[in-house]
Amino acid sequence: MSRRLRRTKIVCTMGPSTDRDNNLEKIIAAGANVVRMNFSHGTPDDHIGRAERVRSIAKKLGKTVAILGDLQGPKIRVSTFKDGKIFLNVGDKFILDAELPKGEGTQESVGLDYKTLPQDVVPGDILLLDDGRVQLKVLSTDGAKVFTEVTVGGPLSNNKGINKLGGGLSADALTEKDKADIITAARIGVDFLAVSFPRSSADLNYARELAQQAGLNAKIVAKVERAETVANDEAMDDIILASDVIMVARGDLGVEIGDPELVGVQKKLIRRSRQLNRAVITATQMMESMISNPMPTRAEVMDVANAVLDGTDAVMLSAETAAGQYPSETVAAMASVCLGAEKMPSINVSRHRMDKEFETIEESVAMSAMYAANHMKGVAAIVTLSSTGRTPLLMSRISSGLPIFALSRNQETLNLCALYRGVTPIYHGEESRTEAGAKAAPQSLKEKGYLSTGDLVLVTQGGQGATQTNVCRTLIVE
């Protein structure tokens, strides 16, 4: 091997900061592997224009960059106040009124964007406003009104979010706006489509169905934000198996289950997603201080590093790159932390699946290659010629410490591989199912500077024709 590669991928959110000062090119050059379009903000034309710039810059820099479209989901929020803001003290009585018009909120009451809240709560429930900064105990309900008492006081301003401790709000995961945004996502051709606040596999299946009807074959990302989706193993597996990618959305999830529980849930989600052959993104406030500071805190460094040690495929930046003052510096700092964490030998070898049966020939070949990589002395890299990206995904579920090069002439496949941990997507124009194509792959990587003469590599590829089988070859770079 002639260069060291970062295995953990970085997802960056686009916004006003990436629209100025050539920052979009700077964050891609600094190491962004996936760019996130937050459909909560901006118009369809904004998103389409940004996608075009991403693809143009990626081509210019010779990089593979995937696009993730993130649907807004239900707006479970208070409405607006006459004066824009109030201050609630502990013990105050406060009414949430679904019939109160916008702009009519006072010290005593405020309207609701989420009109069915009174039907979702019972006396004793705790409502968490503005990520838990203000907390209300439900005393009673009467028609459209929820009568509460303030248990944690503080300022409350327009359009702040509402969560229920322990979850249980019944809002549909997909709104009419989301359905329109799926059409925009299809026009863009996003690689990944994130669904906010899914309650169960049914929400994810519905999103996939709507995407396919729009002509979009994107991988579905489940943003795990509701307490009920992590309440037990069955609920967690239901969400994971219905998705292609899991996002550990620690903001709303942390509010609903409590931050002390979040630590274990993050680790369990990452571990279980990998076991079930799903990719996983860890998100929310990973380098929050770099919105306004040029360096991360030590705590943020440790947070990113711990997600890497947990086995996450990717770590995500939100406001840090969308609205921050130092977007490219944040990406560079995150990349550096990932590389540092990846030096830990304990994360480089996995015994996962040693006692499991394989369900397909493709999986058996992929796992055989990874077993050989972990037990054969001197292997420098794993090379897989892939038309769909499935084999690189399966390989990346096993830790080896070795780079996995996914070679394909299908750009959509390369974009998917941009998210998978340890996988470096490389364009390869040769036919992927022939022996000549397999032998040409290491030479191509040598020419690009990834391999050196004498390197030992494992090469896998699919078969050609109905009578051919998938194969794994051991080759020496000439």
UniProtKB/Swiss-Prot annotation:
**Binding-site residues for ATP, renumbered to this chain:** 38-41, 77, 160
- Point out the annotated site residues (description: Transition state stabilizer): 223
Q: Which residues bind substrate?
A: 36, 251-252, 284
Residues where K(+) binds:
38, 40, 70
Catalytic class of the enzyme:
transferase
Magnesium as a keyword? yes
UniProt keyword Transferase, yes or no:
yes
Query: Which keywords does this Swiss-Prot/TrEMBL entry list?
Result: Allosteric enzyme, ATP-binding, Glycolysis, Kinase, Magnesium, Metal-binding, Nucleotide-binding, Potassium, Pyruvate, Transferase
Cysteine pairings via disulfide bonds? none
- Its Gene Ontology molecular function terms? ATP binding; kinase activity; magnesium ion binding; potassium ion binding; pyruvate kinase activity
| Gene Ontology, cellular component aspect | cytoplasm; cytosol
From the UniProt record, list the reaction(s) this protein catalyses: pyruvate + ATP = phosphoenolpyruvate + ADP + H(+)
| Positions contributing to Mg(2+) binding | 225, 252
From the UniProt record, list the coiled-coil ranges: none
Regulation (activators, inhibitors)? Allosterically activated by AMP and by several sugar phosphates. Belongs to type II PK.
Q: Name one Pfam family in it.
A: PK
The record's annotation in PROSITE patterns points to: PYRUVATE_KINASE (PS00110)
Query: What cofactors are annotated for this protein?
Result: Mg(2+); K(+)
Question: What pathway is this protein a component of?
Answer: Carbohydrate degradation; glycolysis; pyruvate from D-glyceraldehyde 3-phosphate: step 5/5
Q: What is its EC number?
A: 2.7.1.40
Gene Ontology biological process terms in this record: glycolytic process
Domain of life (superkingdom): Bacteria
UniProt similarity note? Belongs to the pyruvate kinase family.
The record describes its quaternary structure and partners as: Homotetramer.
> What is the protein's name according to its record?
Pyruvate kinase
